[in-house]
UniProtKB/Swiss-Prot annotation:
GO cellular component: mitochondrial matrix
Protein name: Complex III assembly factor LYRM7
Superkingdom of origin organism: Eukaryota
Location in the cell: Mitochondrion matrix
Organism: Xenopus tropicalis (Western clawed frog)
One GO-annotated biological process of the protein: mitochondrial respiratory chain complex III assembly
Quaternary organization: Interacts with UQCRFS1.
Keyword terms: Chaperone, Mitochondrion
InterPro entries cross-referenced by the UniProt entry: Complex1_LYR_dom (IPR008011), Complex1_LYR_LYRM7 (IPR045298), MZM1/LYRM7 (IPR050435)
Role: Assembly factor required for Rieske Fe-S protein UQCRFS1 incorporation into the cytochrome b-c1 (CIII) complex. Functions as a chaperone, binding to this subunit within the mitochondrial matrix and stabilizing it prior to its translocation and insertion into the late CIII dimeric intermediate within the mitochondrial inner membrane.
Main location: mitochondrion
Family indicated by similarity: Belongs to the complex I LYR family.
Length: 104
């Protein structure tokens, strides 16, 4: 797949992730839309394959962070906030171990 197709695919993926993550939050949806479009326009004339690859990696990392780390909260009362967890946020719980593993 050539770099142009990869860039377009990432652009679409970021916008789909934005719509999922910020569902029903018009301000956040608009801010994320503007930021995604702004970043892609800023680097529109980039020709270096190495730089394009670096930007694609960064964009992919941003999409993963948005999808797996952002939690949407809704104010229901003056002192209450309801968090809406998506399926992507519900990861396996891996217990933490203080003791270092012994190498054999």
């Amino acid at each position: 797949m050539d770099s142009r197709m990869k860039v377009l695919k990432l652009f679409k993926t970021l916008h789909r992730t934005r719509q999922c993550v910020f569902q029903n939050d018009c301000r956040a949806l608009e801010a994320a839309r503007r930021r995604i479009n702004e970043e892609f326009k800023k680097n529109k004339s980039e020709c270096s394959p190495a730089k394009i690859s670096e930007l694609l990696k960064f964009g992919t990392d941003v999409e993963i962070v948005l999808r797996t780390s952002v939690v949407q909260g809704i104010h229901t009362d003056s002192n209450k906030l309801v968090l809406q967890a998506r399926k992507d946020l519900l990861l396996d719980n891996i217990p933490f171990c203080d003791a270092p593993e012994k190498q054999t």
